Each structure stands twice: as structure tokens, then as C-alpha cells.
Amino acid sequence: MFGYVVVNEQNSIVFLDGNEEFKTIFQSLIQSEITSRKSDLDSASSGVGSSTCTEEQESSLDHFKKPNVVFNSSEISHILLPLILLYRSTSEKTKDPITEMSSQFGTISISKFYHNYLVLVFANDDRKRIEVSQTIEHTIATLFGPLIAFCHTDLTTVKKPKEHLACALTRKLSYSPKC
């Protein structure tokens, strides 16, 4: 799995991409979150539980379909918010931020740059994680500079830098280390 997320100082996602495995894993996390919320609401609303047999059949069919994942940044930020807040609170409280964290999906590296923006890189390969993190930081600083606060908008002055950043990171995503 390999992917990256760039978060601004308001904890909103401004850039996000990854390989198919990354997209599929996050899509399944979103689906499980939605399903668990729905079942919580169903069971709490009337006191009468409902059968989930049809939902299970539908979800098992989804595994056989080719994933066409479109990310909704608010859904992803909902999943990543605890990790982001843990990083920010630890770095404020102890002045010794968490830089890497292991999960069942691989290692997550977190780095802070330019006006409290965070870069989260998800990958199993250490070299790839460091390389992509540095590429993101340098490319954003070079392309956006003081306009970084506007990178999530559709202003004409940030459209080209956003396209260039997407191209540079797509090249990094398609790179596979030689064994």
C-alpha cells in the first residue's frame, strides 16, 4: 500500500492520492464507518433491531467489482482526524512529535512543514516514504510559496501549481523499488 495526505492548519485535507490498494483500504474504512453509524442509528431509533442480511450480500458482491474509488476529503478527514489530533497534541505538549506509526496497513510517517501543514505518507517501503514526503514538501513550497493558504481553492493562480504537483506525485506513486 502506498499513499499520501496533506492536511492544512485547520485539519482539512488539501491533497490526497495513492495507489489502488490505498484507495480500496480507505474506501472500505469509510464503508465500515458508514455501516456502523447506520446500524447504531437503526438500533437506537425505535428500539427494534433490523436484519442486515441484505446489506451483507451487497457488500460481498462489492468485493468482486473493480474499485472505482473517488475520495471525499471530508470522509477521509473524519477517519484520519484522531491521528492528526494525536500528532498535534503530542507535539504541542511534549515538543517531541510522533514521526512514524505502524498500523495493520503499513507504516505512516507524519511530518510538519510550512505553517502547520502536515504530510502523512502511508507506505511499507521506508525509502519511498521519505522520498515522497520530501517531494511533497519541496514541490508545495516551490510551487505555492506564500499562496499555500489558497491551494485548496480554484483560483487561477493555483491551478497550474496544483496540476504540476499532481504530476510530480503521480510519478512518485508509479515508482516501484527494485528488489
Curated annotation (Swiss-Prot):
**UniProt name for this protein:** Gut granule loss protein 3
UniProt-annotated stretches for the region Disordered:
40-59
Composition bias (Polar residues) maps to 42-54
